[in-house]
């Protein structure tokens, strides 16, 4: 699970007005949709100036996060994003929402992340894409959790090929004439 938040959006809205905030958000959401499509990650829901995403493969989630971070530099300038990633089981609740420990952890990690930061628990790293580096981070004490969580910050650029959720299907015969 991935949670993304635009840092400073409330202050930006207060200083620049609703119209400017709406334009920035529309720009960022368009970029987010593109990156999700290119990496095979699904946007589960929009959360105002953020979103929750679901990925089957952790490498796809990491590719998504780092690519979105890069593209958000211009899409939501002068603001930045912060990201939390967590893996685990969850319940699909009433057909359109996910609940569970992994979901809560990803949301709390996003809240704790600094601008331009992508964080993940150390014990949940499964298989990072080539080119991605895990940098030690101080343990985090998160709201609702009894113990500090050991996390790392992910940085770098995935050099292995990202999956495209539609290109693989629609560019092959019999769909191409």
Regions from the PLM with identified roles:
Residues 24, 36, 47, 66, ...:
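Residue-level detector of alpha-helical recognition elements and their boundaries
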Residues 52-161:
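Catalytic beta-strand-to-alpha-helix segment of the class III nucleotidyl cyclase homology domain
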Residues 5, 144, 173:
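Short, conserved phosphate/pyrophosphate- and ester-handling motifs at nucleotide-, phospho-/glycolipid
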Residues 1-63:
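Catalytic NTP-binding/metal-coordinating core of nucleotidyl cyclase/transferase enzymes
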Residues 11, 15, 40, 88-89, ...:
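Generic signal for short, ordered secondary-structure residues
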Residues 45-48, 110-113, 168-170:
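Short glycine-enriched loop/turn motifs at secondary-structure junctions
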Residues 153-177:
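Intrinsically disordered or compositionally simple regulatory linkers and C-terminal tails
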Residues 26-29, 38, 110, 138, ...:
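Juxtamembrane helix-loop transition sites at the ends of transmembrane segments
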């Amino acid at each position: 699970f991935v949670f993304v938040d635009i840092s400073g959006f409330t202050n930006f809205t207060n200083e620049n007005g609703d119209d400017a905030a709406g334009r920035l958000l529309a720009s960022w959401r368009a970029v987010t949709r593109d990156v999700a499509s290119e990496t095979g990650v699904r946007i589960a829901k929009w959360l105002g100036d953020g979103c929750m995403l679901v990925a089957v493969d952790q490498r796809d989630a990491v590719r998504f996060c780092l690519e979105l971070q890069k593209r958000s530099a211009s899409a939501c300038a002068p603001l930045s994003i912060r990201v939390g990633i967590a893996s685990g089981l969850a319940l699909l609740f009433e057909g359109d929402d996910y609940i569970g420990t992994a979901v809560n952890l990803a949301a709390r990690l996003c809240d704790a992340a600094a601008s331009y930061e992508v964080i993940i628990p150390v014990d949940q790293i499964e298989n990072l894409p080539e080119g991605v580096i895990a940098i030690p981070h101080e343990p985090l004490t998160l709201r609702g959790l009894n113990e500090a969580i050991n996390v790392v910050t992910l940085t770098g650029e995935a050099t292995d090929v990202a999956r495209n959720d539609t290109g693989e299907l629609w560019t092959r015969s019999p769909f191409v004439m």
